C-alpha cells in the first residue's frame, strides 16, 4: 500500500532553487555551454543517446547538463522527452557494410581487407592523469589519410568458407517488434531482445558479459570486429516506391565470434553475438554482443545454466530507468506500511518476551 503525500509547496520550490544553484556552481566561472558538452564530453552524450533511444546530440548534452552529470538522470530526462515526439515510420535496416569507418579492429585476423584502423581510442594510453589538460594548451591536429581499400566484414570472410552461421533472416512479412509500445512477454524474439539490450544499462550488461567469461555461460568468444563510423538512415516512402535518405548517424557495431561444437540441428561452426549502439561506445557494444550470444540458448539446444542466459532475468533488469524508479521509490512515504510493520514487531516482541518469561518460570518450578 502506497500513500501519496504532497510536500509543502514552498519547500519544494526552495529545493528546486537549491538544485539550480548547485547546477550553476561558482558564479565567477563561465557556465558550461551545450556545444562544449557535445564537443568535449562526447562519450557521455553518446551513452545518454543510446540508453534513452533518441539520437540527438544537442538534446542529450542538455540532459547531461540539466542532470549535473548524473548519467541515469540524464537518460531519464531524454527518454521522457522522447515520449512527446510524433512517430511517422520505421527506417530501413542500416547497412553497416557501407559504413564510413572511423575505427575498425579485429582480434581474429592480423591482416584483413581494409586493415586495422585504430581511430580515437583509449586502448593505448597509459591511464595516467594528464596535467596538460588543466590549462588551455593547444592540441595537435590529427593526421588524416584518404580511405584505402573497402573495409570488408570479418564475418563475410568466414562466411566465404561456410564456417559461420549466416546473417539472421526474418520470415516473410515479419514486422519488427517495438519494445516501447508493447508489453514484454517471454520468451522474447531476438529482435526485441536486441532492442532491450541496446537501451540497457551499460554497467549491468558489462557485468553480465564479464560473468560469461568467468564460467557462468558457455561462450568462448573472439572479437570478430568492432567498427565505429557513420551510416546512412533511409526511410521508404510508399508514394515514391523507394527509400530516401534522412541523414547519417554515428554508431558502434560489434560482431562477436563464438565457437560452437554443433547439435542435432546445427553443424559445428562459429556463431555470432551482435551489438549495435548509438555513438561511440564499444564497451557497450561488446557487452551487448556477448549477452546476445548467451541468450541464444534455444537456437543451439543449450541448457540455461547461468544468469546471462536467462531471458527474463536479463531483460527484466537491464533497464536503468525502470530500475532507478523502483529503487528510488523507497524514498517516498510509506508511513502506513511502516506503522503496520511497527505494530506487528511490537506484538511479536511482547509474545516473545512472555514466552521467555514463562519458560524461565517453568524451569524454576521443575528445579524446585
Curated annotation (Swiss-Prot):
| GO MF annotation terms | alpha-D-ribose 1-methylphosphonate 5-triphosphate synthase activity
Which EC number(s) does the record attach to this protein?
A: 2.7.8.37
The record, for InterPro entries, names: PhnI
Swiss-Prot/TrEMBL GO biological process terms? organic phosphonate metabolic process
Enumerate the catalysed reactions.
methylphosphonate + ATP = alpha-D-ribose 1-methylphosphonate 5-triphosphate + adenine
Q: Which domain of life is it from?
A: Bacteria
Q: Which UniProt keywords apply?
A: Plasmid, Transferase
Keyword Repeat listed? The answer is no
Disulfides per UniProt: none
Its biological purpose is as follows: Together with PhnG, PhnH and PhnL is required for the transfer of the ribose triphosphate moiety from ATP to methyl phosphonate.
Q: Which family does it belong to?
A: Belongs to the PhnI family.
Q: What is this protein called?
A: Alpha-D-ribose 1-methylphosphonate 5-triphosphate synthase subunit PhnI
Primary gene name: phnI
Amino acid at each position: 500500500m502506497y500513500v501519496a503525500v504532497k510536500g509543502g509547496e514552498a519547500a519544494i520550490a526552495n529545493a528546486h532553487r537549491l538544485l539550480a544553484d548547485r547546477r550553476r556552481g561558482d558564479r565567477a566561472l563561465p557556465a558550461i555551454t551545450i556545444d562544449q558538452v557535445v564537443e568535449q564530453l562526447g562519450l557521455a552524450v553518446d551513452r545518454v543517446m543510446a540508453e534513452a533511444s533518441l539520437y540527438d546530440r544537442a538534446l542529450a548534452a542538455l540532459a547531461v547538463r540539466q542532470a549535473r552529470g548524473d548519467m541515469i538522470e540524464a537518460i531519464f530526462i531524454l527518454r521522457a522527452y522522447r515520449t512527446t515526439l510524433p512517430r511517422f515510420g520505421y527506417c530501413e535496416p542500416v547497412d553497416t557494410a557501407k559504413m564510413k569507418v572511423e575505427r575498425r579492429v579485429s582480434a581474429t585476423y592480423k591482416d584483413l581487407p581494409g586493415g586495422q584502423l585504430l581511430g580515437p581510442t583509449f586502448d593505448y594510453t597509459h591511464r595516467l592523469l594528464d596535467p596538460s589538460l588543466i590549462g588551455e594548451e593547444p592540441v595537435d591536429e590529427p593526421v588524416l589519410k584518404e580511405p584505402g581499400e573497402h573495409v570488408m566484414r570479418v564475418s563475410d570472410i568466414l562466411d566465404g568458407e561456410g564456417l559461420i552461421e549466416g546473417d539472421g533472416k526474418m520470415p516473410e512479412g515479419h514486422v519488427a517488434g517495438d519494445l516501447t509500445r508493447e508489453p514484454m512477454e517471454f520468451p522474447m524474439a531476438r529482435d526485441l531482445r536486441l532492442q532491450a539490450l541496446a537501451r540497457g544499462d551499460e554497467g549491468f550488461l558489462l557485468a553480465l558479459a564479464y560473468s560469461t567469461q568467468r564460467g557462468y555461460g558457455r561462450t568462448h568468444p573472439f572479437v570478430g570486429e568492432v567498427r565505429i563510423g557513420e551510416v546512412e538512415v533511409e526511410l521508404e516512402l510508399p508514394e515514391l516506391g523507394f527509400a530516401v535518405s534522412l541523414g547519417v548517424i554515428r554508431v558502434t557495431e560489434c560482431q562477436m565470434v563464438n565457437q560452437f561444437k554443433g547439435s542435432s540441428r546445427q553443424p559445428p561452426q562459429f556463431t555470432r553475438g551482435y551489438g549495435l549502439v548509438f555513438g561511440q561506445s564499444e564497451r557497450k557494444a561488446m557487452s551487448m554482443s556477448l549477452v546476445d550470444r548467451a541468450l541464444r540458448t534455444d537456437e543451439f539446444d543449450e541448457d540455461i545454466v547461468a544468469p546471462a542466459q536467462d531471458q527474463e532475468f536479463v531483460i527484466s533488469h537491464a533497464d536503468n530507468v525502470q530500475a532507478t524508479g523502483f529503487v528510488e521509490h523507497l524514498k517516498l512515504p510509506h508511513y502506513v506500511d511502516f506503522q503496520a510493520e511497527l505494530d506487528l514487531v511490537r506484538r511479536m516482541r511482547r509474545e516473545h518476551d512472555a514466552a521467555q518469561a514463562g519458560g524461565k518460570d517453568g524451569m524454576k518450578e521443575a528445579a524446585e
